[in-house]
Amino acid sequence: MNNYETVFILNPVLSDEQIKETVKKYEDFLVSKGAEMVAKEDWGLRKLAYAIQHKKSGFYHLFEYKAPGDAIEPLELEFRREERMMRYLTVKLDKHAIAWAEKRRKRNKEKA
């Protein structure tokens, strides 16, 4: 199993309930594909660097997880089909990125 991090941006016109429903849908999808969730972060509504689909902001979310390599392609296919999804990016984490992510989680936990 490899370590991955996925950041996705949801449409800013969604209600809180729709956002929670969408995030839960993709978390469940990953778990059904054999992934183990390491961390989830809700970065909230943020301004975009440039307009996407005529929108200037979006709700950012981050998933960090361990998954088999064949789980990523179906996830990204589902992202492409989702109307609520504006953008997404999945990266495979190397040992340095894993260490940095652990530091980030620890720092965020201390702030909370």
From Swiss-Prot:
Kindly list the GO molecular function terms attached to this UniProt entry. small ribosomal subunit rRNA binding; structural constituent of ribosome
Name the GO terms of the biological process aspect. Answer: translation
Q: Which domain of life is it from?
A: Bacteria
Q: Name one GO cellular component term.
A: ribosome
SUPFAM superfamilies from the entry?
A: Ribosomal protein S6
> Which chain regions cross the lipid bilayer?
none
Keyword Glycoprotein on entry = no
Keywords of the record? Ribonucleoprotein, Ribosomal protein, RNA-binding, rRNA-binding
Which family is this sequence assigned to?
Answer: Belongs to the bacterial ribosomal protein bS6 family.
- Explain the purpose of this protein: Binds together with bS18 to 16S ribosomal RNA.
PANTHER family from the entry?
Answer: MITOCHONDRIAL 28S RIBOSOMAL PROTEIN S6, SMALL RIBOSOMAL SUBUNIT PROTEIN BS6M
Query: What is the protein name stated in its UniProt record?
Result: Small ribosomal subunit protein bS6
Which organism does this sequence originate in? Christiangramia forsetii (strain DSM 17595 / CGMCC 1.15422 / KT0803)
